[in-house]
Curated annotation (Swiss-Prot):
Cofactors that this protein relies on: [4Fe-4S] cluster
Residues that coordinate or bind [4Fe-4S] cluster 1: 11, 14, 17, 58
InterPro entries the record matches: 4Fe4S_Fe-S-bd, 4Fe4S_Fe_S_CS, PSI_iron-sulfur_center, PSI_PsaC
Cofactor note: Binds 2 [4Fe-4S] clusters. Cluster 2 is most probably the spectroscopically characterized electron acceptor FA and cluster 1 is most probably FB.
Species per Swiss-Prot/TrEMBL record: Prochlorococcus marinus (strain MIT 9312)
Membrane topology qualifier: Peripheral membrane protein
Stretches assigned to the 4Fe-4S ferredoxin-type domain: 2-31, 39-68
Signal peptide: none
Keyword Transport appears in the UniProt entry: yes
Record protein name field: Photosystem I iron-sulfur center
GO biological process, one term: photosynthetic electron transport in photosystem I
The EC number(s) this enzyme carries: 1.97.1.12
Amino acid sequence: MSHAVKIYDTCIGCTQCVRACPLDVLEMVPWDGCKAAQIASSPRTEDCVGCKRCETACPTDFLSIRVYLGDETSRSMGLAY
């Protein structure tokens, strides 16, 4: 079952989510939108098992990273009718 990982622009570039992921689904990429000049990216979502450790590790009040499991993926991305 595939999962979607969405990184929001409230990411502060702290790397907590990247370090929390046991399967290296996430990585940091350059971004000028925060002081850290980097943002989380999810280039390997096919490896995501939906453990949501990245969500738990996120220190922002906005939960800058979200994992949408299976059926949630279509609904959360606005693709379901």
